[in-house]
């Protein structure tokens, strides 16, 4: 399938000193049950895990039961790509953490990759026919507000082609009247673990081909496509496993008055722009308000070529350890998460709802645009399969920023 071709073909991106980057932790929502309880283990992508723990605690406060048994929920944070790989390899609790009954990665793209991996390894299927959505957040190009405004934001539609053009110009930001900003500097996350990294890579291929769907192996092998994506990669000066690597480092740079020199742009989820602008790059509700807001805030550029949506699916695994009681508990918790109260809670932290409808925080004042994105890209279909791994060579100027535990993915 084309999605797997992209993952296989961009392995070169992860050979720059990065580590596993699963960004997991074993924190859970506190149990409230005694006796014979139904314990539902949920593994969530890291950017929403802490919020999901709060919602799970609220849910348990209502005293839910299944067949007369109390329900308790344990939420574990693990980066989407790390969880996908762990499930595909059989999930070793000693190294991978608590085994999930429900998996909620940031994007359905990881679900399709797990399906392909298990089929290729001749393992039993783990994905149910339906994977409902609990929240959404589009991929954006986050840029310091003064830089984005120098390019015409918010009036001008910008995209990957504009970044490629800027990155190719030896005069850098001088062409836009700001020689003090130096060269254009792009940040990127590991597409094997980070949803924003995966979606940014796929988005660059779509931009190169000027397609919005039906990306084929022939498109990937086209020399013009390869040249475009290689050009984008040559602008990458910081390369790490997760979004948090960049946003935490950018916060430290901003604290030192260097918010415009660390990086020019990085692909992240829309909600991560809001998190950074609140002084809370981890997105953890418990740390909101504990750090000053940045001197130089970020804004979201929604690629004019179209973008991908992190759709946060709710995947009740079809695995032997997930019995009927757990499935009923998962369905009941899902109903709670999709109801108005929980949906509003997601929107309080700049997520969009499961239908991608923006909430009250998606405003220009917050660096976000509620009339964007204008176009959504259709992810590569899982039915397409290939062993093609042709990709542009690794840019030699790229450096790794290392692993940061607990980061979004």
Predicted regions and their residues:
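Extracellular/periplasmic juxtamembrane helices and adjacent flexible linkers that interface
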Residues: 1-21, 315-409
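A conserved helix-loop-strand patch within extracytoplasmic ligand-binding domains
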Residues: 118-193
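Ligand-binding pocket segment of bilobal, Venus flytrap-like solute-binding proteins
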Residues: 203-300
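Short beta-strand->loop
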Residues: 43-45, 153, 167-175, 181-197, ...
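Periplasmic-binding protein-like
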Residues: 128-141, 226-236, 240, 288-320
């Amino acid at each position: 399938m084309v999605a797997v071709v992209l993952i296989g073909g961009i392995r070169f991106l992860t050979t720059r000193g990065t580590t596993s980057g699963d960004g997991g932790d074993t924190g859970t929502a506190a149990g409230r049950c005694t006796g014979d309880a139904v314990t539902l283990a949920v593994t969530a992508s890291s950017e929403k895990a802490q919020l999901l723990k709060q919602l799970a605690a609220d849910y348990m406060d209502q005293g839910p039961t299944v067949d007369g048994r109390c329900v308790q929920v344990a939420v574990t944070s693990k980066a989407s790509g790390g969880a996908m790989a762990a499930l595909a390899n059989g999930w070793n609790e000693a190294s991978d953490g608590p085994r999930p009954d429900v998996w909620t990665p940031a994007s359905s793209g990881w679900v399709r990759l797990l399906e392909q991996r298990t089929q290729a390894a001749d393992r039993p299927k783990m994905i149910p026919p339906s994977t409902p959505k609990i929240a959404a957040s589009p991929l954006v190009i986050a840029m310091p507000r003064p830089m984005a405004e120098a390019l015409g934001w918010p009036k001008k539609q910008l995209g990957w082609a504009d970044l490629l053009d800027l990155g190719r110009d030896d005069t850098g930001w001088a062409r836009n009247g700001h020689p003090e900003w130096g060269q254009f500097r792009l940040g990127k996350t590991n597409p094997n673990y980070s949803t924003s990294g995966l979606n940014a890579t796929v988005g660059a291929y779509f931009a190169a081909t000027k397609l919005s769907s039906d990306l084929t192996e022939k498109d990937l092998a086209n020399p013009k496509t390869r040249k475009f994506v290689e050009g984008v990669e040559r602008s990458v000066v910081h390369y790490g496993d997760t979004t948090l690597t960049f946003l935490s480092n950018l916060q430290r740079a901003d604290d030192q008055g260097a918010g415009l020199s660390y990086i020019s742009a990085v692909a992240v989820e829309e909600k991560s722009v809001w998190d950074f602008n609140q002084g809370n790059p981890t997105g953890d509700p418990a740390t909101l308000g504990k750090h000053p807001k940045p001197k130089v805030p970020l804004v979201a550029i929604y690629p004019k070529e179209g973008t991908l949506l992190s759709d946060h699916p709710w995947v009740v695994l079809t695995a032997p350890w997930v019995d009927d009681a757990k499935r009923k508990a998962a369905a009941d918790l899902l109903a709670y998460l999709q109801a108005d109260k929980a949906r509003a809670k997601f929107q309080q932290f700049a997520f969009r709802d499961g239908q991608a409808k923006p909430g009250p925080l998606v405003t220009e004042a917050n660096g976000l645009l509620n009339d964007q994105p204008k176009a959504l890209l259709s992810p590569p279909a899982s039915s397409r399969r290939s062993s093609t791994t042709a990709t542009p060579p690794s840019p030699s100027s790229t450096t790794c920023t290392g692993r940061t535990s607990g980061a979004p993915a």
